[in-house]
Amino acid sequence: MMVIYYLNWNGTMKELHEWEEEQKKMWAKVEGVKVWGIYTPTIPWNRAWLMETDSIDKLFEHSGPRTENIRNTDMVILM
């Protein structure tokens, strides 16, 4: 199953890059979840993570608390 996770960042660019590196390291340890890439669709503060997972439950189980710098999010599940 493929998942597109959109987010609108509300912090500094440095904080965004640090958060993304932490997330990549965390997801690399989760069996059954693969990050295919992080894309900037419109402006630098928007991101779209393309991920593959065995189960949507794995994403929710490991995602942890949301940082205050993420303003809006959307998730699209592609089966």
Model-flagged regions — what are they?
Residues 1-64, 68-79:
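Short S/T/G/P-rich N-terminal loop/turn motif that feeds into the first structured element of a domain
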